Regions:
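Short, conserved catalytic/metal-binding motifs centered on acidic residues
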Residues: 31, 46, 70, 114-119, ...
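Short capping segments at the starts of secondary-structure elements
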Residues: 38-42
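DNA-recognition alpha helix
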Residues: 43-62
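Active-site- or DNA-interface-adjacent structural scaffold in DNA-acting proteins
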Residues: 65-129
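Electropositive, glycine- and tryptophan-enriched low-complexity nucleic-acid-binding patches
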Residues: 129-175
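Short acidic loop-to-helix transition motifs that present clustered carboxylates
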Residues: 158, 183-185
């Protein structure tokens, strides 16, 4: 059986102290992802999703949570997370969803096509604090229809070094990258 997203979330370090952990971290992260896929955009909506669907989630994921964590617990857990560790968990999970052609013998003749593109998040700027809008870079595998990786671009940088870092992280062997024309520079 292939590893699940829950098993990858189990590897994310828990930001909470040892005592008083009523809820394991991995299920809370998984339930948060499911809540967001269902349209939740706030901590309260994530809490409401978990509370409403807790019995079904326990059955589907073979868990035994007696009650949903409070809104404040969800908020505390999510705000304390290490974003880089969570990103690694998502990347490792995405790698299991692929076709596996990178390691196959035909990787040189049939490369994995990966599109890399950056997007500015609408409404993410903060004029009061003089913060520019958030800009994200994503790598998308065409055949598998999944995002392999994404990263935030620093305010004082641009897409060019971010694309180079992303390509290095993903590895060049067996891949055909498509990028915007501005990346065709020395």
């Amino acid at each position: 059986m292939s590893p699940t997203l829950l098993s990858f979330f189990a590897e994310v370090p828990d930001p909470r102290r040892g005592q008083g952990k009523m809820y394991p971290l991995a299920p809370i992260l998984l339930f948060t992802v499911l809540a967001m896929l269902s349209g939740a955009v706030s901590y309260r909506q994530v809490h409401a999703f978990i509370k409403t669907h807790l019995d079904r989630l326990n059955v589907v994921f073979d868990l035994s949570l007696r009650r949903a964590p409070a809104y404040s617990s969800v908020r505390f857990i999510l705000r304390g997370l290490d974003g880089a560790a969570l990103e690694v968990a998502f990347r490792r999970h995405a790698a299991t969803l692929g076709t596996g052609r990178i390691d196959a013998d035909d990787a040189a003749t049939k490369p994995v096509c990966v599109a890399i593109d950056g997007k500015t998040l609408r409404g993410s700027f903060d004029a009061f604090n003089d913060r520019k809008a958030a800009h994200l870079m994503s790598a998308f595998a065409h055949d598998d229809q999944i995002i392999l990786a994404h990263l935030a671009i620093d305010e004082k940088s641009n897409e060019i070094p971010a694309v180079q870092d992303l390509m290095t992280t993903l590895g060049l062997s067996g891949k055909l990258f498509t990028v915007d024309a501005m990346h065709a520079c020395k």
